[in-house]
Amino acid sequence: MLKNQRALGFALVFLSSLGFSMAPTFSKRAYESGANTVGVLIVRFTIAAVLMLLIRQFSSGQRVWPKPRLMFDLFLLGAIGYSGAAFFYFTAIENMSTGVSIVIWYIYPVFVVLIGWAVFKTKPKRQTIFSLISAMIGVAITAGQPGNATTKGVILVLLSSLTYTFYTLSGSRAFKKTDLYTGVTFVMTGAATAFWLYWLLAPSSTPVTFPQHTSGWV
């Protein structure tokens, strides 16, 4: 059973990484079609929230809504944590290549381990430390190549990684109190709400633009 769980865990991490690496490609197409970061993320998270609500509603098994306090915590995880990480990341890929952005972004496990060690006293194993050092060397080499990265882009990606770290550490505790579908539904709803509020409240000097052509929506 343990081996099956580990295999499933590796598979899910791989699929998550694959999906995250593909997102910038679609975003670039939207940018080329006239959209900006917030316009892309409004569409992305609104669709995600609706889909997760439908999946939760029609998936097998009885699912109960969590207590109001937990609902609020999950909503804030999306409205502050996940939306913040996405905003920094998708803004970064407007300033440098998507490939470099992805590589640098994956330094976030280093932040997770270090902050988890400092805050939750979770001491990493030797294998983990070795893997993280290797990852940091790879990121440094990639970011240091001439013309590959910009200072602004690197800072934005690192901010995204750091924000996602706090989201991961906070979410690991909140998600234990509810089922996965319910938790993700509230997180996506929180993220979508944050960007809709930005659109409604943003000054005219920072307009939100959506794709102007069909290719940007596909």
Ranges and model annotations:
Residues 1-43, 146-173, 193-197, 216-218:
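Glycine-/small-residue-enriched transmembrane alpha-helix faces in small-molecule transporters
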Residues 10-14, 68-77, 124-136, 153-158, ...:
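Cytoplasmic-side transmembrane-helix entry/capping segments in multi-pass membrane proteins
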Residues 19, 24, 53, 57-99, ...:
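Specific transmembrane alpha-helical segments of multi-pass solute transporters/efflux pumps
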Residues 19-34, 47, 86-96, 104, ...:
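Juxtamembrane C-cap of transmembrane helices in multi-pass membrane transport proteins
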Residues 33-84, 111-112, 163-170, 184-203:
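Transmembrane alpha-helices of multi-pass small-molecule transport proteins
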Residues 39-50, 86-121, 160:
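Specific alpha-helical transmembrane segments that line the substrate/conduction pathway
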Residues 52, 115, 124-144, 161, ...:
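Hydrophobic transmembrane alpha-helices of multi-pass small-molecule transport proteins
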Residues 91-96, 143-152, 173, 205-210:
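Membrane-interface helix caps and helix-loop-helix hairpins in membrane proteins
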